[in-house]
Amino acid sequence: MAKNAMLCLLILRVVLALAFATNKKGDEEPENHSTGIFGKVGRVVTVALAMSSRLGGADATRGGGAVYGRDLKSNQLPNNNWMAPPPPMAIRSAKVYDSKHSPAEYLKKFAQDFRRKTGMHSQRHHEETTLEQEKRVAGAGPDPIHHQDTTLEQEKRAVPAGPDPKHHEETTLEQEKRAVPAGPDPKHHEETTLEQEKRAVPAGPDPKHHEETTLEQEKRAVPAGPDPKHHEETTFEQEKRGAPAGPDPIHH
């Protein structure tokens, strides 16, 4: 501030000195009096401003950046790092392409990471389970026909004798032999075999499928023997036994 005040006083002194000098010349030269006092003052002010601008520029260059006696450092903010750039941020970018991995592998890995982060899955993932998941659930492996029929290996594990070749519609000959020692019925159990009937009935099966009893069985049941006419009429000997007077001659 003191330097600025001294500079202003110096300029005023120069201006006043020039003004008085021009006034004296005006008195000596009356022919130039037509310009007037205002023209002289204007010229003096112009010269003073030019001198002050030159002096200010010289002081600035001499003072190392000082303008009107003031240092530029006083205009700076208290923070000395106000023009410093912000610290570098950590940029999370994709990995640099490596020659060991192909672009297809990078795309596949990126898709897997994206699905894991967003929780999205492909449509096929929800429609069908993978082969590896089915193998984990079933030790024997998944069914190739999508669990519609059990596989041959699984049926062998469940049934030691093996699966039925006709999908369990009929039992196999080997399984029937195990269940029935005498063997299965060749007509699918519609009729019992002759050997099985002999075992059940010591006298043997009825050759007419039990529709009529045999002569030997009737003899065993009735000591007198069976009726030769299939029991439709009693015999003469039976009637004699039933009625002491003998049978009726009209009936027989």
UniProtKB/Swiss-Prot annotation:
Region (6 X approximate repeat A), start-end ranges: 127-219
A- repeat segments run: 127-135, 148-156, 169-177, 190-198, 211-219, 232-240
Species of the source: Globodera rostochiensis
MF terms from GO for this chain are:
receptor serine/threonine kinase binding
Recite the UniProt keywords alphabetically. Answer: Apoplast, Differentiation, Glycoprotein, Host cytoplasm, Repeat, Secreted, Signal
Biased composition of type Basic and acidic residues is found at 125-137, 144-242
Q: What is this protein called?
A: CLAVATA3/ESR (CLE)-related protein 4A-1
Record's family? Answer: Belongs to the CLV3/ESR signal peptide family.
Stretch list, region 6 X approximate repeat CLE: 136-252
Family annotation (PANTHER family): PROTEIN CLAVATA 3 (PTHR36349:SF2)
Q: What main location does UniProt list?
A: secreted
This chain's function reads: Mimics host plant CLE extracellular signal peptides that regulate cell fate. May play a role in the differentiation or division of feeding cells (syncytia) induced in plant roots during infection.
Q: Where is the signal peptide?
A: 1-21
Which parts are the CLE- repeats? 136-147, 157-168, 178-189, 199-210, 220-231, 241-252
> Which cellular components does GO assign to this protein?
extracellular region; host cell cytoplasm; host extracellular space
Show the segment(s) annotated as Required for secretion from the host cytoplasm to the host apoplasm.
Answer: 21-83
Q: In which tissues is it expressed?
A: Highly expressed exclusively within the dorsal esophageal gland cell during syncytium formation in host plants.
Ranges for the region named Disordered are 116-252
Where on this protein are sugars attached? 32
- Where found in the cell? Secreted; Host cytoplasm; Host extracellular space; Secreted, Extracellular space, Apoplast
For the biological process aspect of GO, one term held by this record is:
cell differentiation
